[in-house]
Swiss-Prot record:
This is Multifunctional CCA protein. Mg(2+) binds at residues 21, 23. PANTHER family: MULTIFUNCTIONAL CCA PROTEIN (PTHR47545:SF1). It comes from Escherichia coli (strain SMS-3-5 / SECEC). GO terms for biological process: RNA repair; tRNA 3'-terminal CCA addition. InterPro entries: CCA_bact (IPR012006), HD/PDEase_dom (IPR003607), HD_domain (IPR006674), NT_sf (IPR043519), PolA_pol_head_dom (IPR002646), PolyA_RNA-bd (IPR032828), tRNA_CCA-adding_enzyme (IPR050124).
Length: 412
């Protein structure tokens, strides 16, 4: 029996990145030997075991053979005669097909070290094309390691295109698509994930609402980058700098979906694109089964981001109504989330990357003023039932009006 550290732990250690999870491959053993040694079996379809002390995963070396459609249609073979090289060959990328023995020696049968050095994401073998989930995984790796200068090998991108055009991605379940997307949204450069999907044709298949934005012009005066698809990826990049939250990043990604519905004869104007985009947000989220909390913020951002851009022109009543509309009294975090997504929208434009966004500050200040109006004082003043809410709203409007007079500049 020989045990090797494999995959991501080896890769990230070589890149000088923190190692989170360690996975091991066991060569020359059987399930019974593992159980006799005190390991606990957890894999139903293939033999994976938990170490009795560390609870890290130890898998018997195995091969996989395509036996059906999609990413689940595989038959596994695990036996003592399966070599380490056999096991590593079934992995997706060469940089993930590295192993380390107990002496610290690196085993590299597929030139993963060379590809690490050259910052290349390259598939190990043609078997890559049998698993459509790998298209999303490679896009996610491209986003995860973009800051280190990684790029996808030309032949791998070509294979991803072939898989997409062959309809392989249609076998992916919504849950898996969202899981990979959510993971990509946590990376330093989530926009790269969507750019890669576009480069291989997968964006049109999985995110048609986003793909439809490319080639749609916006007024050059406000959008020097002109193309709404490019603007969308720029805003996502900016959102990633402003917030680590998936909610904020996803909402930013979806903020301009309504522009994809504008008839070409009305271009480059997009009046009413915010409310129009709400239905597309709902459509996308329903299809991918996006969690409700993430979906709800994306809907609100689509509907209200342009309103926040015009904050100095809003009257106090409209400002308080905005807080009502986003349910800020019960979910105060939404004020900050809306401020960040709106800022990402403004700064996600060519030449505006370092622009100030005072509207975000004013939104936060107005919220602090509105929420500081005490409910208790209204009740103690003798108001009852529905009168309490009406009086509370009236006092909040008055407080915001007073603040606006002193702190928020009047529009020209």
């Amino acid at each position: 029996m020989k045990i090797y550290l494999v995959g991501g732990a080896v890769r990230d250690a070589l890149l000088g990145l923190p190692v989170k999870d360690r996975d091991w491959v066991v060569v020359g053993s059987t399930p019974q030997e593992m159980l006799d040694a005190g390991y606990q079996q957890v894999g139903r379809d293939f033999p994976v075991f938990l170490h009795p002390q560390t609870h890290e995963e130890y898998a018997l070396a195995r091969t996989e053979r395509k036996s059906g459609s999609g990413y689940t249609g595989f038959t596994c073979y695990a036996a003592p005669d399966v070599t380490l090289e056999d096991d590593l060959k079934r992995r997706d990328l060469t940089i993930n097909a590295l192993a380390q023995d107990d002496n610290g020696e690196i085993i590299d049968p597929y030139n993963g070290l060379g590809d690490l050095q050259n910052r290349l994401l390259r598939h190990v073998s043609p078997a890559f094309g049998e698993d459509p989930l790998r298209v999303l995984r490679v896009a996610r790796f491209a986003a995860r390691y973009a800051h280190l200068g990684f790029r996808i090998a030309d032949e791998t991108l070509a294979l991803m295109r072939e898989m997409t055009h062959a309809g392989e991605l249609e076998h992916l379940t919504p849950e898996r698509v969202w899981k990979e997307t959510e993971s990509a949204l946590t990376t330093r450069n989530p926009q790269v994930f969507f750019q890669v999907l576009r480069d291989c044709g997968a964006l049109r298949v999985l995110f048609p609402e986003i793909d439809a934005l490319f080639g749609v012009p916006a007024p050059a005066r406000w959008h020097p980058e002109i193309d709404t698809g490019i603007h969308t990826l720029m805003t996502l990049s900016m959102a990633a700098m402003l917030s680590p939250q998936v909610d904020v990043r996803f909402a930013t990604l979806c903020h301009d979906l309504g522009k994809g519905l504008t008839p070409p004869e009305l271009w480059p104007r997009h009046h009413g694109h915010g409310p129009a985009g709400v239905k597309l947000v709902e459509q996308l989220c329903q299809r991918l089964r996006v969690p409700n909390e993430i979906r709800d913020l994306a809907r609100l951002v689509a509907e209200f981001h342009d309103l926040i851009h015009t904050f100095p022109m809003l009257n106090p009543k409209t400002i308080v109504k905005l807080f009502d509309s986003i349910d800020a009294w019960r979910k105060p975090q939404r004020v900050e989330q809306l401020a960040l997504t709106s800022e990402a929208d403004v700064r996600g434009r060519t030449g505006f990357e370092s622009a100030d966004y005072p509207q975000g500050r004013w939104l936060r200040e107005a919220w602090e003023v509105a929420q500081s109006v005490p409910t208790k004082a209204v009740v103690e003043a003798g108001f009852k039932g529905v009168e309490i809410r009406e009086e509370l709203t009236r006092r909040r409007i008055a407080a915001v009006a007073s603040w606006k007079e002193q702190r928020c500049p009047k529009p020209d």
